[in-house]
């Protein structure tokens, strides 16, 4: 398996595939991955072109997770890809609320998620946080209210 080249959030595409094909996993307290936020990193950039690419690439990742879900032979793998897709969709909604400049841009991302059956967020009981966020973001007007509250931070 390889990282998908030239996209942001390539780890969101790669990691689920890695887990699905691993055969076995070991739980350990060893730190094998460290994430460092840099001021100049892509995810911290306010550049409009980078933000546009970021959301385009997030949708690519959702599409690829859907493809992996359909192609998976084992039921557990199908469920894992499905769950990862739905939880990544939550991340896309949250990032849209935080980063996109206006209601129209947010509405466009929501429409694209809806076309993929990822918004409103599917009813699933992954965690109480997922359920709460799903209820708070199941309508565009609710998202617009939350966006205003986030801007006040």
What do the PLM-derived regions correspond to, one by one?
Residues 6-10, 53, 77:
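Conserved aromatic-histidine-acidic binding/catalytic patches
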Residues 1-48:
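Conserved nucleotide-sugar donor-binding catalytic segment
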Residues 82-94:
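Amphipathic alpha-helical repeat scaffolds of TPR domains
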Residues 31-39, 45-73, 95, 100-119:
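Catalytic core of nucleotide-sugar-dependent glycosyltransferases
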Residues 77-83, 107:
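Short, charged, amphipathic alpha-helical segments
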Residues 97-153:
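Membrane-interface aromatic/basic loop that binds lipid-linked glycans or pyrophosphate carriers
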Residues 19-22, 28, 42-44, 55-62, ...:
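Gram-positive cell-envelope targeting signals
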